[in-house]
């Protein structure tokens, strides 16, 4: 199968190539696409070199599938053009996520919503994906009423420039800044732009996407998202109120049996999820599982995942695998 990766030279695009290879996705020919400044560069995939081309030429090459990770403006302009040419697009930007005509998919939760007619499929926000993968089995059993999430997010979510800024600051080297402030030895309580309601766009992504993925507009969600000087993955402190009471042992059992979830929760041995351990893993790690002592039917969780993998590239490839396995691609 011919597969295009739009944004192939970025952090997520590079990870998409890695994940496609690792999971043995049937790529007969890779079509790497990037911006003007990357045209003519070569990327290596499965031992072969491929030249980076522009989006127009990629459409002419007639791939069956295009994985997009080149930002919202690129997706808004080019995804419909790819789709019009009969190419299935899985888009990692926020461009199509809340479009009522587009599916927002986390395969462990709502892959059954997909159909052969879906030409543009949205990949959710990284911080949303890991949270809903962990919470969905609990929602099925106890019905979530309210979620309060605080995130501790990796600089890799911003991109190459942010990683470079962090590494430069650690070495005491001056360079281009991805953030308005230093990130090393710091925590920046702003991810994306502030909106009129006082929340950031990232925070509202978590609010709105959670409801759409879990197909339940009654769930109340509030979030505070924070960038921290970490590279391995995103961490989240999540407080969840349910309609029904629960037993902690049953919660652990449900999470242990959930697809894509690994429970790491042994406080006595100082065992809990950390971004360093989640790095280059596809699972969502859950720990610090405990009842909220201040409110009935309420649980605290600590959720960690590699935002470039399950939070982006792996989730997109899993969507493609589902389409392929069900004769939709």
Residue spans of the language-model regions?
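Charged docking surfaces used in two-component/phosphorelay signaling
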Residues: 66, 155-329
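N-terminal Rossmann-like NAD(P) cofactor-binding subdomain of oxidoreductases
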Residues: 1-183, 218-220, 284-285, 289-295, ...
